[in-house]
Amino acid sequence: VFGLHEFHTDRDDVTYVQCESEVHLLKEFLVFWEKHQPDIITGWNTEFFDIPYLCNRITKLFGEDELKRLSPWGVVYSKDIYKMGRNHQVYAIQGVAGLDYFDLYQKFTYTAQESYRLDHIAFVELGEKKTGNPYETFKDWYQKDYQSFIEYNIQDVEIVDKLEDKMKLIELCLTMAYDGKVNYTDVLGTVRYWD
């Protein structure tokens, strides 16, 4: 976990890197990313929130050349797509498959849910409830109780891990891609897999 303020944990499975500024944080993150270059990134709604936010901040603070460090091939591009009634900016990090668990869940589970918020899906699939935001906004939470704010974000990651442990949707995606001789993300479409 990378952050700007003090955070304390006794957990052996959580490492916290306290940074002096956003610039310092993103530099440390890029070094970590390159050292542990992922093949796949996942999370809940990462395609429309986490990845665009991260890419836009890196571009704004450092420029396009630093953004390219996310790709083992040095190629990152953005495009606008229309989904859920509005335009969204999304990024493709070449050489790193973005498998948004939100999309995997919608594609490979055949029961409509009343909500696709992670909290609801965690309750339906795992019997778990996420910690609620005790403040008016996430900004308030971040500013007034940084410790529990970071714990909440760790909980999000753990829920996606538990969903994968139970449902094996990434494993399914990889198996289908291997069998179909296509890229991992092609499995999320409707045509490419069958070509």
Each model region followed by its residue ranges:
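Amphipathic alpha-helical segments that form well-ordered structural scaffolds
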Residues: 28, 53, 121, 159-163
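Common nucleic-acid-contacting/processivity interface regions adjacent to the catalytic cores
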Residues: 139-195
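Alpha-helical interaction scaffolds
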Residues: 1-26, 32-34
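Short secondary-structure boundary/capping segments
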Residues: 52-65, 178, 191-194
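Hydrophobic/aromatic beta-strand patches that form the interior of the parallel beta-sheet core
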Residues: 2, 42, 97-100
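Active-site-proximal helix-loop-helix substrate-binding element of RNase H-like nuclease domains
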Residues: 9-16, 20, 37, 51, ...
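Short, hydrophobic/amphipathic alpha-helical packing segments
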Residues: 26, 30, 154-157
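Proline-aspartate-enriched helix->loop->beta-strand connector
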Residues: 29-53
